[in-house]
A protein has these predicted regions:
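Non-globular, low-confidence helical/coil segments that flank catalytic cores
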Residues: 1-306
Length: 306
């Protein structure tokens, strides 16, 4: 156990629907350190309710702010109407990095909007870096993100397994894609990251399936994690039993829409998580899921929606 008491409490806030209208890129060769004032020793992970998609905001020590993916297949203008307003509500005026796990629309549609708004001067929010998986072939959506970043004067970084990015005391290790990844199967070659902050460990798995989970188990000595962003919105073909037996997540968050037609999350995946003794939070039932971390404990806040 990394914490004597990892999840201090699960707080439920009821909302009725009718009321809701060093960047040290390790690369084993070079590194740049992003320096800044340490306002307070904390980490805040917000898994936003973007419908059938992913959008996660990380706030690190009151100084660094990151977006991991940002898109939806069933909500239009999710960047304009959900992600940007959320950032403003948190007083965030700068994103130090936007991490894109892969280029499916349900992970990038909102990010495209944000970059377009930045490029046109339609938002006061600034973006420093766009971090993409290092693929040998760059699909159309990948090239579009590059172009939007260039117009917005946002630096593009490409990362692969073995790279490390540090923000203050938070360390992001890139576990996937492996060197030489082509980019043909964007799900299985998606960016996978492990976040370490003090004793806390979180795993962000994009849309990988069991095939890549097995490769990760072979390539790394994966250990227990406190937080797991469940891959592919809870698909039956991800989050396998063998993988869960290794990473043993204390908390798992599934981002999906209540009206999705894919059967997400699958009963099989939910059963595997339950058998692993994992606390499950689902954005289709809870809305946004907020995880607050300090050096000793992890607090979770979720919203029960009628």
């Amino acid at each position: 156990m990394m914490y004597e008491k990892r999840i201090e409490r699960i707080q439920r806030v009821r909302i009725r629907r009718w009321k809701l209208p060093m960047l040290c890129v390790g690369m084993l060769g070079f590194g740049i350190w992003l320096l800044g004032y340490r306002a307070r020793p904390n980490l805040r992970i917000a898994c936003l309710d973007v419908g059938q998609g992913d959008g996660i905001v990380l706030e690190i020590e009151g100084t660094w702010n990151l977006l991991i993916d940002g898109g939806s297949s069933n909500k239009s203008a999710v960047g304009q109407y959900q992600i940007l307003p959320y950032l403003k509500s948190r007083g965030i005026s700068r994103l130090d990095g936007i991490f894109i796990s892969h280029t499916d629309g349900d992970h990038i549609s909102g990010t495209e909007e944000i970059l377009e708004y930045v490029g046109k001067g339609l938002t006061s929010i600034r973006v420093d870096h766009l971090i993409l998986p290092d693929w040998e072939e760059e699909p159309e959506n990948y090239l579009k993100l590059r172009e939007l970043a260039q117009t917005a004067d946002v630096q593009v970084l490409q990362v692969k397994a073995g790279d490390r990015i540090c923000y203050g005391n938070a360390q992001l290790d890139i576990l996937w894609p492996e060197k030489g990844a082509v980019g043909e199967d964007v799900n299985e070659e998606a960016m996978v990251m492990e976040l370490e902050y003090g004793k806390f460990k979180g795993l962000f798995t994009g849309d990988i399936g069991m095939e890549t989970e097995k490769k990760l188990q072979s390539a790394y000595r994966l250990e227990d994690v406190d937080f797991l962003k469940v891959a592919h919105h809870g698909s039956r073909y991800s989050t396998g039993e063998e993988f869960l037996n290794v990473v043993k997540p204390e908390l798992a968050v599934i981002s999906c829409s209540a009206s999705n037609t894919y059967g997400h999350p699958s009963p099989e995946t939910l059963r595997r998580l339950e058998n692993a003794g994992t606390e499950i939070c689902r954005t289709d039932r809870s809305g946004a899921v907020i995880v607050k971390v300090d050096e000793e404990k992890m607090k979770v806040q979720r919203f029960v929606i009628d």
